[in-house]
């Protein structure tokens, strides 16, 4: 890409004015005496000590009331969840819930629905969807209570997890009939589930025609739809929606162009990518921080460190300081291209520029070293990040455990698993399955079984044990 075509951007720097009002102003005392400041002592009728004590007392009382309310809601939610679990043939959920005599509030509804969502599994999907809807109907019938948009969204999430797509659509209709507008969050929930079911286009068409779609904070409904489609990687559908958008007389903005640029890159349409970039400039839109992030990703994966350096320098010239995100995106791309020397160069340049590498950046570097078989450098980077106060996350640990296993250092890998748990970082299924798979390949079957037993003992991924027994990396 010819970066000479990149237009400069006007940088608007907001000035913030802070106004400090001192209590000293009440009595005219600015550190001098009556003669120094020219004002006599003023009595504002404010006894500071007694009033502060009173305010503190009120604060404690408010906090206490709030704590009691939260405790009461959590306790009531637990009772409701236990009651719903009693569901059997002939079970009258309405009368049983009435007998609980709980105070229905938005918090109670949220806690119950979240509780159902957490307990949802492959075996109880249909039951969970039914119980959630029964509770939703019952709570909506209680006096002095009305469901919120968040309540509808939580129930939609449960329906989505349970594969109840028709129920989701009916709930959207109920939500609109109840006077609530559909939002970008509503559409996002629908598109995530409908995309998996092959109904994404149907959802898009309905929202494009909807008169109750509250698309804020986006410029128009099309941007809200395009943004959600990008999140679920519906690239072909993005192209179709963009054509509909132009036919309806809507103009693209920087966000629209960024979505289209990324879409065409993912579809491998680089000629179209270049044309869009030029079109963006002709329409008077300067590349923003996200546009440059896309460019750096492409240059990184294309193993073009010199062009990337030119882009970073150009960003500074137009007033956009490269952030940790920009450097990490570039380093990730170069790492995937196998250019770890360039990765280290840009990591050092990042530090020189005053950007502190975060856990994601370090994890990208560690993963790159592991993949290339440079375990010693991965270990060194792991030590460096902890010394500099960046706590490893589950992805960091997974990369390190994989690297140790690849090098046959199984004792260290098992020790690292215990370390991450002691630091409050819960291993995910990938961590366990990676370790078990490599132990098996090395013929260390007893050690592999021990890891599985520890996992089950802690209650982690018990339902996935059969999958792990067949797991091969």
UniProtKB/Swiss-Prot annotation:
Positions annotated as PPR repeat: 148-182, 183-217, 218-252, 253-287, 288-322, 323-357, 358-392, 393-427, 428-462
Matching InterPro entries: Mito_RNA-Proc/Resp, Pentatricopeptide_rpt, TPR-like_helical_dom_sf
NCBIfam families: PPR
Pfam families to which the protein is assigned, alphabetical: PPR_1, PPR_2, PPR_3
Signal peptide: none
Key words, A-Z: Repeat
Protein name as it appears in the record: Pentatricopeptide repeat-containing protein At3g60050
Sequence similarity: Belongs to the PPR family. P subfamily.
